[in-house]
Amino acid sequence: MDYYRKYAAVILVTLSVFLHILHSFPDGEFTMQDCPECKPRENKFFSKPGAPIYQCMGCCFSRAYPTPLRSKKTMLVQKNVTSESTCCVAKSLTRVMVMGNVRVENHTQCHCSTCYYHKF
């Protein structure tokens, strides 16, 4: 009988520690965050009152899958995983000067397309 009480005590302590850790995080910490749609959003750093600068921001498609054997045979350096992705890029833009002599792109339309600059 005393043997079962020890196990019950250990289980209760473990459960209470787990619940304490779980409740110490803000709401939604463990849930998947929604990824915003790819669209122009205001860049607060370059924008001025009355002259907003927009940059494309948001999420697009990406996936990884095992490299097909037929493709693997043609690779100089074989890799087991192949990945595909698209990035949120400007479909149309205008170049503007801000802060005197800094040229930036003011994005007017965005879409998901080939990633040219990869962020690490």
UniProtKB/Swiss-Prot annotation:
Gene3D superfamilies: Cystine-knot cytokines. Residues 1-24 form the signal peptide. Transmembrane segments: none annotated. InterPro entries: Cystine-knot_cytokine (IPR029034), Glyco_hormone (IPR000476). SMART domains: GHA (SM00067). Its main location: secreted. Coiled coil: none annotated. Disulfide bonds join 35-59, 38-88, 56-110, 60-112, 87-115. It is found in: Secreted. One of its GO terms (molecular function) is follicle-stimulating hormone activity. It comes from the Eukaryota. One of its GO terms (cellular component) is extracellular space. Belongs to the glycoprotein hormones subunit alpha family. Shared alpha chain of the active heterodimeric glycoprotein hormones thyrotropin/thyroid stimulating hormone/TSH, lutropin/luteinizing hormone/LH, follitropin/follicle stimulating hormone/FSH and choriogonadotropin/CG. These hormones bind specific receptors on target cells that in turn activate downstream signaling pathways. Heterodimer. The active hormones thyrotropin, lutropin, follitropin and choriogonadotropin are heterodimers composed of CGA, a common alpha chain described here and a unique beta chain which confers their biological specificity to the hormones: TSHB for thyrotropin, LHB for lutropin, FSHB for follitropin and choriogonadotropin subunit beta/CGB for choriogonadotropin. PANTHER family: GLYCOPROTEIN HORMONE ALPHA CHAIN (PTHR11509), GLYCOPROTEIN HORMONES ALPHA CHAIN (PTHR11509:SF0). This is Glycoprotein hormones alpha chain. It comes from Macaca fascicularis (Crab-eating macaque). The lineage of its organism: Eukaryota, Metazoa, Chordata, Craniata, Vertebrata.
